[in-house]
Every structure is written in C-alpha cells, then in structure tokens.
Amino acid sequence: MKYIIKLFINLIFISISFNLLLFSNCIANEIKLFYEIYYGPFKIGESEIQIFSSKYTAIVYSVGLAKSIFPFYAKWETWVDEKGYPKKAIIYSKERGKERKRAIYFKREENKIIYQKLLPNCEEAENIFLEFPIYDELSSFIASFYIDYTIYPRIRLPLFIKKKRDYVKIEFRERKNCEFEKEKKECLYIEVYLPKKSELLERASEVEILLLKDKKVPLELRGKLPIFGSLVGKLKKIENL
C-alpha cells in the first residue's frame, strides 16, 4: 500500500515541458484545480494546484483509509519569471511524521542552481552548474498545458531533477471525446515517459494524460504500476481566482 500511495503523489508532479526556446508564460487567468486520486474504486488522495502568473503551487495529501495507513502531505511552490522559467522552488513533504524540505534557486545569468536541504537537517547550500534554460518539475507541468501538440507531437526536453539535468519525452497520440461537468469535450491523449527520479520520491516511468483542449488543463492522469495496475487522478473542479 505504501508504494501504491506514493505513486499517486507523482501523478500531480508530472514533469513535462514546452519547447524551451519558444515557450512564454501563456497564463491568462489565475486558477485553482482540484483533483481526486483513485486506486481502482477507492479514493486515496486529493490534490490542489494554484496557477498564478508569477507563482505555481501544488498540494497533495492522502485521505481516508490511505491516510490512516500512510499519512502523507506535500507542498511544492515554484516562483517563475515572465516567461514561465523557475526562479525559486520550495519543496516540503511530511511522511508519517518525518519532514523534508528543500530550497532551489535558479540563476539563469550564471548557469547556476543553488540547492539546499532545510529539513530534516539544515545543510550547506550547493552550487550546481548546468546548461540553461531548464525547468523544475512543477513549472514544466504547468508549461505543458500550453503546448500546441499539432506542431510539437514529440518532444524531448531537459529538466532539473536530483541535482542533475535529465530528460522527459512527451508524445501526442490522438484526439478523444471526453466529458467534464456533464458537457461533451474534446481531449488530447498524451503519453509521457519520465525519469524515475524525482525531488519527492520514485515514480512510475510512464504516465498517460487526457488534456482538455479548450481549458488547457489535465482532465485525467493515469500512472502505470506493474502488477497492481493504474492509479488515476481525476479533475473535479476548476476555480477562477
């Protein structure tokens, strides 16, 4: 059960990104997204994602029986510039009473990332020199909403994960009919191939996404877990702020 619950957490922190040379911050409205996460018929978690022009926040936590077995809470905050690139990220998690917290600062002018662990023990900051531009996991997730998949059906992009520059592959497969709030919608079916590493924990390497074409947000996220099958994150509500 522990590993099943851990997998759903990463459905929210999916690392997919836009063409880094062409992307600009396309956020027109400030919104909050509410998701419920299921293992089969059982609801095991919830998530909230807040999207502002200068800051993104994702919160995820276990609920119900899953919370009693594996209590988990995580909050990821990323401050971004006018083009959507990360300037600073604060990542906090609490798992069965054990707290972890990290701060990451992106210095694009110097091709430098400052990485510091704050909890459970405060450690000395590290300077990591990598090629820019580069995204963290949350900012790349938000950026992915605005990709024109008819122009970019296959993309391989760099991400900052675990002190290194890694890559994610994203492939547009097909258009699908879907439903949200009792209305028929058009969705884009996308497959994402992720590094198994994450700033939070290990995750599934393949994730499927149904993206609402008109609202430009994920309607459904599905992570593949060998033997056990798939966990599903479902969009329940969009709130304009």
Language model features with spans:
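Hydrophobic, well-structured mid-protein blocks that either form specific transmembrane helices
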Residues: 101-145
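Bacterial N-terminal signal peptides
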Residues: 8-21
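Positively charged n-region of N-terminal signal peptides that target proteins for export
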Residues: 1-6
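Acidic, serine/threonine-rich low-complexity disordered tracts
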Residues: 26-109, 149-241
